[in-house]
Amino acid sequence: MKGIILAAGAGTRLYPASQPISKILLPIYDKPMIYYPLSTLMLAGIKDILIITNELDHDNFQKLLGDGSQFGINIQYKIQYVQRGIADAFLIAEDFIEEDDVALILGDNIFHGFGFSTFLKQALEYKYGATVFGYRVKDPERFGIVEFDKDMKAISLEEKPLNPKSNYAVVGLYFYDKHVCEYTKSLTPSKRGELEITDLNKVYLEREQLNVKILGRGFTWLDTGTQDSMLEAANFVRTIQANKGQQISCLEEIALYKEFITPDELEMKLARFKGKSAYYDYVYDLINEMKSTQKKLVLK
């Protein structure tokens, strides 16, 4: 499976903060926002990743993440020149996807929870169709909504309905089979001229190929599209990290945990950052622990 991060939005709701730089590069507490969705794909075991940016911020993303080799992964980049909706990502990425399954995550979505890596692994066990994730919200009219029957089988999807049929939002993480580009090409742009991700999911639903997994108690989903939600996310990350003494979405830690890279390789790649910040002190502590104990890293 390959992965796509859609990070092309202008972030106008955050102006003036996002005028000089993409909102996806703004910090959520101690790390850039892009680290959080990238960590989700890495936790799912995905190593080939495409980041779709806007034209202005393309170079900034490359400067931050490079080709991904420092994490033992492969990162490519493409530009979305015109905002044509979330599903447009699959048309932009068609030559990257080829005949593979693909995961798409929105650049401003943060996920956290005990056992999240195992949860993602279970979701990847579906060998056909699409898998999306439902999360209970108090304001469903703001989101794409999935309705279930009495057996919790998805029966309908609606985009920001005035009268929601459920309180379960479809979050910004989607897994698709190799037919996703074909199905995307069949979509008609919405009234706002965009290829809607809800319409794509409806194609899979109509074919009885849509799987919905619920992010239940113990999992947190944060959509950081506003100033208040960014502050909420930063406070959440700060609190969890302070209480547990562990980083959230530390890419180097996940790379070690998934064995994408060895401690020695990572130490060499991070030499210029040694002693520069608390974040890198944390990474070096992990490296030293692994080298001294010769044990595999356990991600808690």
Predicted segments, located by residue:
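Catalytic-core segments of class I nucleotidyltransferases/pyrophosphorylases
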Residues: 103, 121-124, 153-253, 264-265, ...
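Conserved N-terminal catalytic core of the sugar/cofactor nucleotidyltransferase
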Residues: 2-5, 13-16, 26-27, 31-106, ...
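Conserved donor-nucleotide/metal-binding helix-loop-beta segment in metal-dependent transferases, i.e.
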Residues: 113-141
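Active-site glycine-centered loops adjacent to acidic/histidine catalytic or metal-binding residues
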Residues: 9, 108, 136
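A secondary-structure boundary/capping signal
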Residues: 106-107, 133, 176-177
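A structural signal for short hydrophobic beta-strand segments in well-ordered beta-sheet cores
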Residues: 25, 146-148
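Charged/polar low-complexity intrinsically disordered segments, enriched in acidic residues
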Residues: 255-257
